[in-house]
Amino acid sequence: MGLEAVIDEITEKGRKEAEAIRKESETEVAQVLAAANVKSDQIKTAVDEDVARQEARIINQEVSAANLLVKRSQLNAEKSLLDQVYAAVLLEVRGASPDFHRAALSSLLQQARAEIGEGMIHASARDLPMVQTLLKEGSYPGFVAGSPVDIDGGIIAESRDGLLQVDYSYRTFLDRVWESGLKNASDILFG
């Protein structure tokens, strides 16, 4: 074998080894790229899912905030309307006929007599003359008319020693009725 044949054989062997190394490298590169693509797809999918979750959470928060704002506005409007109804009822009671006030005051005096027995009866400046008349006409011994007080109607009964005061004012009765019937009134007005 000549030197040229040895050189050709070595060259051929080197070329084959280089080709094998190149093919092995290409296979390795293809595997690394495939793994990188899989990992990249996994990361992209995870990011997309996270973005979708964050978007849904933000939308839910915004919807909840908007619903709360609407509910608050609705409740404020309902409260305003209920306050107007309360004021209208109180105005209507204040403006009732003298016969109504006389009957109401007579009934309240009977309640005061049953609860405290004797004492002083205070009333609004409008009702005080009627209270004085009822005290003189009725069977209310031990009760005297007191000074006028700032109430819409009704009476304030005070024991003789001043330790007990019972509020029979129209506003107090209206407040009791209002508190006990507020849910029903709200249901009727606002469904």
Swiss-Prot record:
Main subcellular localisation: membrane
Compartments (UniProt record): Cell membrane
One function term, GO molecular function aspect: ATP binding
Membrane protein topology class: Peripheral membrane protein
Gene3D superfamilies according to UniProt: ATP synthase, E subunit, C-terminal (3.30.2320.30), F1F0 ATP synthase subunit B, membrane domain (1.20.5.620)
Organism superkingdom: Archaea
Family as reported in the entry's similarity comment: Belongs to the V-ATPase E subunit family.
Record protein name field: A-type ATP synthase subunit E
Protein source organism: Methanosphaerula palustris (strain ATCC BAA-1556 / DSM 19958 / E1-9c)
Source species taxonomy: Archaea, Methanobacteriati, Methanobacteriota, Stenosarchaea group, Methanomicrobia
